[in-house]
């Protein structure tokens, strides 16, 4: 099963992380890497995991990035910069 790196920003002050954290930690048995970054094993691809996590976000301004650790396949919502524009 691939390992995904999940990074998020809940952008409004005072937002509660409980639903997202519960999904990441308990349902997906992920491990926190940084304050807002987790490592998660999941079947499927980055888009499938993003679709699974999306209901845990609080509002439309939240940001979420899911990236396969090995293949670098990724999916995101409201990213600050577009990954396609980053030169190797």
Kindly give the residue locations of the regions a language model identified.
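Short, structured coil/loop segments at alpha-helix boundaries
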Residues: 20-25, 59, 76-80
